[in-house]
């Protein structure tokens, strides 16, 4: 489940034979993935991650009341300046509410000025809690490389209007950039 307001993630339990609301088992400001359950057991394994937290493997009871982290991948990044991710919102030039993600350098100081890179392609705010491996890409930038070198990276959602890709992009992107400059 993906709450629209926070972009957090969770697992829920539901009985389709009743009209009762699903019961939350685990939810929060992270991304849960890869849940597996073996036959004849009351345990699952799954991964939990965020932009700052490596997608470690967890072992839990079916009700998620007892959970153990099995791996500690975050140890490999302890010697690096690791940035943070923040969800932001603004209004486009054509009046639509938009969201995006701002990736800030480690030890971000709001009183200080930083260079900013704008990286965009359609809608990516849903990736707020995705862990990104620091590696070169051929079609996007390495957020960690730029964060560790003192850059802010802004990834705004773009809502395209059919037949008007350039104007749509401008209408979405420019107010988002102006909002960040004004902060």
Residue positions per predicted region:
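Serine-hydrolase catalytic core recognition
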Residues: 33-183
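Alpha-helix-centered segments that form part of catalytic cores
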Residues: 5
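Residues that act as N-cap/strand-start positions at coil-to-secondary-structure junctions
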Residues: 8, 29, 82-84
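Generic preference for hydrophobic/aromatic residues in regular secondary structure cores
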Residues: 11, 31-32
